Amino acid sequence: MSDYKVKFVDYPAQYKVHKKELDAAWQKVMEGGDFILREDVEKFEKNLAEYVGAKYAVGVNSGTDALMLTLKALGIGFNNEVITSSHTFWATIEAIENLGAKAVLIDSVDGLMVPEEVVPQITQLTRAIIPVHIAGAVCDMEFL
């Protein structure tokens, strides 16, 4: 147990709020064995696509895989550069480098990437920018 007075995320409290619904869903999936490329996944993907207004959605097992598939779909690979914040979870950099690309890190004072820091890092090898929003603050998405 940590000595922190304020928890970053209180998972037990969040679980208690949704316990009945989560437990029922978990039990249904586990008892049916329908959790890998089956009906429940198809329903999830369809519902997610509708929710975000997309034609398709793909369920994956982790945020790392989601980042890797997105970068791969964009054709990013060897000898490419992807700009992102140094204040990110390690999986962001792992996804970039697993495809053979180079992560170009922006080290901002407040953790948010701003045009003045990003523009000088853009080269002919730059293929993407992955913004990282920190503590409820949002990067300048119009610029990015």
Predicted regions and their residues:
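Solvent-exposed, non-membrane alpha-helical residues enriched in polar/charged side chains
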Residues: 23, 27, 45-49, 68, ...
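N-terminal "arm"/small-domain region of PLP-dependent enzymes with the aminotransferase-like
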Residues: 1-34, 39
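Hydrophobic (often cysteine-bearing) scaffold residues that line and stabilize catalytic clefts
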Residues: 18, 22, 44, 63, ...
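Phosphate-binding glycine-rich loop
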Residues: 33-81, 94-99, 105
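PLP-dependent aminotransferase-like
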Residues: 72-144
